[in-house]
Amino acid sequence: MKIVLFGATGNLGNVILDEALNRGHQVTAVVRDPSKLATTHAGLTVVRGDVAQPSSYAGTLPGNDAAIASLNDHADPANVPRQATLLLETLSQAGVHRFAWVGGAGSLETAPGVRVIDDPGFPDAWKASAKAQIEALAVFRASKAPIDWTYISPAAEIAPGERKGSFRVGGEQLLVNAEGHSRISTADFAVGVLDRIEKGDAAKKRITLAY
């Protein structure tokens, strides 16, 4: 497949990039600063572009089969839902009709009507980013764009680790293991993202990945 990836220089985006290239996909990485992307590969094309400025990358989109966005803006989290809106519009205009968005875990439910972010112990430092991702999810759900989006929430804890290739796929509820922990490695999260892109089996849905 031909895939355009936004956010390839981020910690998680770079793992997703490696997974896509290792599967033999042709990847166009749209990054603000190409010098920050150390990956080199025959299947990789790097394009300088800013999600906030569609004209900087719109010309590279036609002909791609799918797109993946792994974005964050800790300096101004309010940019995140705006990025979702722009990408939905720009990708659909370019004829890219499959789109995976790396979301957050804060909107997952721990009980009916109770979200992860509603827990009194939810860290204050993460709240702005979590709220921004909740707003992004609302953008996707309200969108009328002709694009098969999938909003993919990680487990509550996601960190570098082993690529096991085995994990669970859920929906609106936070997935926890027998000990009550919600975890996944970045490597296995990337596996799940590429699985969804290849299969296209979660169109217009939010899903979550965890052990």
Q: What function would you assign to each model-found segment?
A:
Residues 4, 35-93, 201:
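NAD(P)H-binding glycine-rich loop region in Rossmannoid oxidoreductase-like domains
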Residues 138-159:
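Conserved beta-loop-beta element that borders a ligand/cofactor-binding pocket
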Residues 168-184:
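A conserved pocket-lining segment of Rossmann-fold NAD(P)-dependent short-chain dehydrogenase/reductase
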Residues 3-23:
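N-terminal Rossmann NAD(P)H-binding glycine-rich loop of SDR-like oxidoreductase domains
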Residues 76, 106-111, 157-161:
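Conserved catalytic-site region of short-chain dehydrogenase/reductase
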Residues 132, 180-194, 205:
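Substrate-positioning beta->alpha
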